[in-house]
C-alpha cells in the first residue's frame, strides 16, 4: 500500500502572503478630548508566538518606513529562532537562519542582482563579527572563514531546500542557470521527502529544467524517501518529454519501482493518465505487475474510476493483455473494487467487454464473416419483402421487424471497438447485385438503344469493384514505414537540446507524430495527414489513399447516373407502360408491379449516390481549402466548447489550482485530499501530486481531448490554407513532408 504523505512545507505556502504590520493602537486619555496620537510601536511579548511572518527581501525592505524596518528585523530574528526551536533540529550552519530565509526568498523571486548583493551582505556581516577568545568563538570563526559563494548558495532551510529548489519551483530559468554556474549542489535532497532539484523539475513538469540539470551533472538514479526517482515523478505529472529524456539518458522504465513496488503504469493509471500508461506498456512495463498490496494498474484504474484508463488497459492484446482475474491481498478483483467504489460506468463497461470477449468464442474472423453475411442479407431481405409481400403488409413488417432486429443484433453481436464489415458488405453487395440485374435483364434490351451509357456502366462498375477492394487493403500513409523509433528519439533529443518545437510522440507506435497525423485505434497505426476513418471501407483515409478514395466515390456516382439512364430506357421499352407525364402515380405503380426489383434498386442507388456525391465533394473541398475532415470536426468541437460556460462547476473537471496547506507555490500535495482516503481501509494510494491535477475521466471529460502531452491543442484551423492552387500542389506533389514534418511552420502566420 502507498502510505499517506504528510502535508508539505508550511514555509513554501506561507511565503505567498503579504507582510503584516504590528502597531500600537492609539491611546485615549480618560475625561480628555480625543487627540490623534502618532503611531507608537512596542515589541511583542518575548514569550508570545509569532503565528506567521512574510519574508521581505532587501529591495522590498527599502520601501518601508525606517521604524517598520527596525521592527521587522527584530521579528525576523524571533521568527527564525522560533522556527529552529519548533523543528527540534540542531542548527549548525555558519550563516544565521534569518539571513538564510531572506536569501531563499530572493531565489524564489528570481532577482539575480539582489541575490548577488545579499551574498555579499552575508559575507561582510559574518566577517565583521567580533568573537571571544573562547573555544566556541574560535569554532565560529573557522566556520565563517569557510563561507564561499558555493557554500552560501547551497544553504538550506529547515526543510532541507536550497536556493535552486525554489528557483525551479518558480520556473526561473535565469536564476537556475546562475546557481548552476556558481556551483549549486544538484543532488542535495531535502529533509522531508528526500527530493532533489531534479525531482522538483519533474514535479513542475518542465523538460527544459530536467535537461538543464541532467546535462550539468544531476543524478537521474537518486530516489526520494518513498522510492520515487525522477521518472516516476515525471510520469505522475504526465510529463512525457521529461520521461522520454530520462529514458534516453539511461533510466529503464521496466526496472523503476518505488518502495511499495508501484511501477510507472501503476502511478499513471492511478492518476488517470491513460496515454502515459499506454506509453509505458508499449515500452515493456508489465501491466500485470502487482504492488505490495497485490494490486495491478487495472485495480487502481477501477478504484479511482478512470474509465479511459480501464478501457485502454482492456484494449491491449497478446502478451500485453491484462489479466482481469488477478486478486489483491484482500482477495478482490478489479471488478469487485469498482463495485465497492460504486463506479457504475466502469462496471457496465467491464460487463460489456466480458460479453464481447466471449462473442463467437473470441474468433474475430468468424465475427467478420457473420457481419459480412448480415450486410448481404440487409440488401436482399428488404428487397425480397417489398417485391413479394403487399406493400400494406411489407412496409410495417420492415419497419417493426427491422427495428427490433437491428437493436437485437447491436446489443448482442456488435463490438464498437472492432472494425465491422456490415457497411462495406452492404455497399459492395448492392452494386454487385445491381450489376448482375443489369447484365441479365437490362443490357440485352437497351444496348442497341444507347450504347454510350452502357459503356460507362461497365467501365465504372469494374473500376469500382477493383478499387473498392484495393481501398480496403491500401496503406493510408503509415508513418512508421518512413521513420524508425531510433530516428524519432534522435530527433526528439535534438529538438529538446536546441530549444525547437518538441515533437509529439505516439504512445502506441513510439514514433514522433508529424503535424496533422493521428493514431487510429481501429487500424492500429499513425497515418500522415489523417482525414478520417471510413466505416464503409474499414480503413483510414490519409495522404496516401485519399486521391483513390475520391475517385472511387465519383465512380459510384457516375455509375448510378448511367444506371438510371439505362434503367429509364429499359422502362420505356415496355409498350404497355403508361405515359409518365400523364400520371406519375400510375406509372410508379405499374413499374413497381412489373419491375419491383429493378425499381427498388434504382431508388436505393439514387439515394446512395446523393449521399456519396456529397461526401465526394466534401473530400475535394478538404484539398482545395487544406483542412481535413478531422480538423473540421475539431474546429466544430472547439466552437461548441467556446459557446458553453467556459468554466467548471466542480463535478466534471478537477481544480487547476491547489488549496490550503497541500499546495502553495510548489504544487506538490501529499495526503488523502485528492484521493478518497488513506490507509489500508480506503483502498487509495493516499499520495497525490496536487499542483497539476490528473486528467478528467471519460465520465466527466469534454469531447475535446485535453491530454496536452500527447495531442496538439490546435485553435487556428485555417493556418494551412495558402490558396487553392498552392493547396492542390502541396497535396499532389509535396506529400512526403507529411511523414516527417513535426514542426508547425504555419503556427504563427499564414504563408
Swiss-Prot record:
Catalytic activity entry: L-cysteinyl-[protein] + hexadecanoyl-CoA = S-hexadecanoyl-L-cysteinyl-[protein] + CoA
ANK repeat residue intervals: 159-188, 193-222, 226-255, 260-289, 293-322, 330-359
Feature: compositional bias, Gly residues: 660-683
Membrane topology, from the record: Multi-pass membrane protein
Positions annotated as active site in the UniProt record: 534
Superkingdom of the organism of origin: Eukaryota
Disulfide bond annotation, renumbered to this chain: none
Protein's cellular compartments: Membrane
Database matches in SUPFAM superfamilies: Ankyrin repeat
EC assignment: 2.3.1.225
GO cellular component, one term: membrane
One GO MF term: protein-cysteine S-palmitoyltransferase activity
Pfam families: Ank, Ank_2, DHHC
Glycosylation site residues: 161, 626, 656
The record's note on its domains: The DHHC domain is required for palmitoyltransferase activity.
Protein name: Putative ZDHHC-type palmitoyltransferase 5
Protein source organism: Dictyostelium discoideum (Social amoeba)
Amino acid at each position: 500500500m502507498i502510505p499517506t504523505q504528510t502535508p508539505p512545507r508550511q514555509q513554501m505556502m506561507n511565503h505567498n502572503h503579504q507582510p503584516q504590520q504590528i502597531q500600537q493602537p492609539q491611546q485615549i486619555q480618560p475625561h480628555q478630548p480625543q487627540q490623534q496620537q502618532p503611531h507608537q510601536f512596542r515589541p511583542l511579548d518575548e514569550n508570545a508566538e509569532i503565528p506567521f511572518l512574510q519574508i521581505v527581501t532587501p529591495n522590498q525592505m527599502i520601501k518601508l518606513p525606517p521604524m517598520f524596518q527596525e521592527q521587522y528585523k527584530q521579528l525576523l530574528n524571533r521568527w527564525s529562532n522560533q522556527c529552529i526551536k519548533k523543528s527540534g533540529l540542531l542548527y549548525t550552519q555558519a550563516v544565521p537562519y534569518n539571513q538564510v530565509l531572506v536569501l531563499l526568498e530572493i531565489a524564489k523571486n528570481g532577482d539575480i542582482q539582489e541575490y548577488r548583493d545579499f551574498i555579499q551582505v552575508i559575507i561582510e556581516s559574518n566577517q565583521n563579527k567580533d568573537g571571544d577568545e573562547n573555544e566556541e568563538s574560535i569554532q565560529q570563526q573557522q566556520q565563517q572563514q569557510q563561507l564561499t559563494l558555493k557554500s552560501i548558495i547551497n544553504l538550506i532551510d529547515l526543510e532541507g531546500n536550497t536556493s535552486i529548489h525554489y528557483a525551479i519551483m518558480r520556473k526561473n530559468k535565469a536564476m537556475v542557470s546562475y546557481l548552476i554556474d556558481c556551483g549549486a549542489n544538484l543532488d542535495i535532497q531535502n529533509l522531508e521527502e528526500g527530493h532533489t532539484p531534479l525531482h522538483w523539475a519533474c514535479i513542475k513538469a518542465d523538460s527544459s529544467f530536467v535537461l538543464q540539470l541532467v546535462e550539468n551533472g544531476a543524478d537521474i538514479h537518486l530516489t526520494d524517501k518513498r522510492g520515487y526517482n525522477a521518472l516516476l515523478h515525471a510520469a505522475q505529472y504526465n510529463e512525457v518529454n521529461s520521461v522520454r529524456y530520462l529514458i534516453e539518458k539511461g533510466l529503464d522504465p521496466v526496472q523503476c519501482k518505488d518502495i511499495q513496488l508501484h511501477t510507472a503504469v501503476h502511478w499513471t493509471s492511478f492518476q488517470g493518465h491513460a496515454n502515459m500508461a499506454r506509453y509505458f506498456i508499449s515500452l515493456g512495463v508489465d501491466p500485470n505487475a502487482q504492488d505490495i498490496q497485490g494490486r495491478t494498474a487495472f485495480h487502481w484504474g477501477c478504484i479511482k474510476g478512470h474509465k479511459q484508463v480501464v478501457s485502454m488497459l482492456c484494449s491491449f492484446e497478446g502478451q500485453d493483455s491484462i489479466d482481469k482475474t488477478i486478486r489483491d491481498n484482500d482477495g478482490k478483483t478489479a471488478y469487485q473494487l469498482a463495485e465497492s467504489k460504486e463506479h457504475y460506468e466502469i462496471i457496465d463497461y467491464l460487463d460489456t467487454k466480458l460479453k464481447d470477449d466471449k462473442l463467437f468464442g473470441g474468433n474475430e474472423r468468424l465475427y467478420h464473416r457473420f457481419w459480412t453475411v448480415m450486410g448481404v442479407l440487409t440488401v436482399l431481405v428488404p428487397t425480397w419483402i417489398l417485391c413479394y409481400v403487399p406493400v400494406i403488409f411489407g412496409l410495417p413488417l420492415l419497419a417493426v421487424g427491422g427495428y427490433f432486429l437491428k437493436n437485437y443484433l447491436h446489443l448482442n453481436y456488435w463490438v464498437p471497438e472492432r472494425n465491422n464489415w456490415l457497411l462495406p458488405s452492404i455497399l459492395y453487395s448492392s452494386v454487385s447485385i445491381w450489376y448482375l440485374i443489369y447484365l441479365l435483364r437490362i443490357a440485352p434490351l437497351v444496348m442497341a438503344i444507347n450504347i454510350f451509357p452502357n459503356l460507362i456502366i461497365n467501365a465504372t462498375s469494374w473500376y469500382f469493384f477493383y478499387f473498392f477492394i484495393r481501398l480496403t487493403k491500401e496503406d493510408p500513409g503509415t508513418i512508421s514505414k518512413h521513420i524508425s523509433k531510433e530516428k524519432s528519439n534522435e530527433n526528439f533529443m535534438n529538438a529538446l537540446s536546441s530549444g525547437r518545437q518538441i515533437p509529439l510522440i505516439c504512445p502506441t507506435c513510439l514514433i514522433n507524430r508529424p503535424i496533422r497525423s493521428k493514431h487510429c485505434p481501429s487500424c492500429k497505426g499513425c497515418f500522415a495527414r489523417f482525414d478520417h476513418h471510413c466505416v464503409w471501407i474499414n480503413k483510414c483515409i490519409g495522404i496516401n489513399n485519399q486521391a483513390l478514395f475520391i475517385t472511387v466515390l465519383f465512380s459510384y456516382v457516375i455509375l448510378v447516373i448511367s444506371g438510371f439512364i439505362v434503367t429509364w430506357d429499359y422502362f420505356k421499352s415496355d409498350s404497355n407502360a403508361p405515359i409518365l407525364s400523364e400520371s406519375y402515380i400510375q406509372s410508379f405503380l405499374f413499374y413497381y408491379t412489373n419491375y419491383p426489383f429493378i425499381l427498388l434498386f434504382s431508388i436505393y442507388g439514387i439515394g446512395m449516390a446523393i449521399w456519396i456525391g456529397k461526401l465526394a465533394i466534401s473530400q475535394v473541398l478538404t484539398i482545395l481549402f487544406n483542412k481535413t475532415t478531422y480538423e473540421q470536426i475539431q474546429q466544430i468541437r472547439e466552437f461548441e466548447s467556446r459557446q458553453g460556460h467556459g468554466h467548471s462547476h466542480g463535478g466534471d473537471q478537477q481544480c487547476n489550482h491547489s488549496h490550503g496547506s497541500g499546495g502553495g507555490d510548489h504544487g506538490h500535495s501529499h495526503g488523502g485530499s485528492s484521493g478518497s482516503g488513506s490507509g489500508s481501509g480506503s483502498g487509495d494510494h493516499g499520495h497525490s501530486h496536487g499542483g497539476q491535477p490528473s486528467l478528467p475521466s471519460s465520465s466527466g471529460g469534454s469531447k475535446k481531448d485535453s491530454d496536452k502531452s500527447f495531442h496538439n491543442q490546435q485553435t487556428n484551423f485555417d493556418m494551412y490554407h495558402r490558396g487553392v492552387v498552392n493547396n492542390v500542389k502541396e497535396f499532389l506533389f509535396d506529400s512526403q513532408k507529411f511523414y516527417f514534418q513535426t514542426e508547425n511552420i504555419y503556427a504563427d502566420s499564414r504563408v
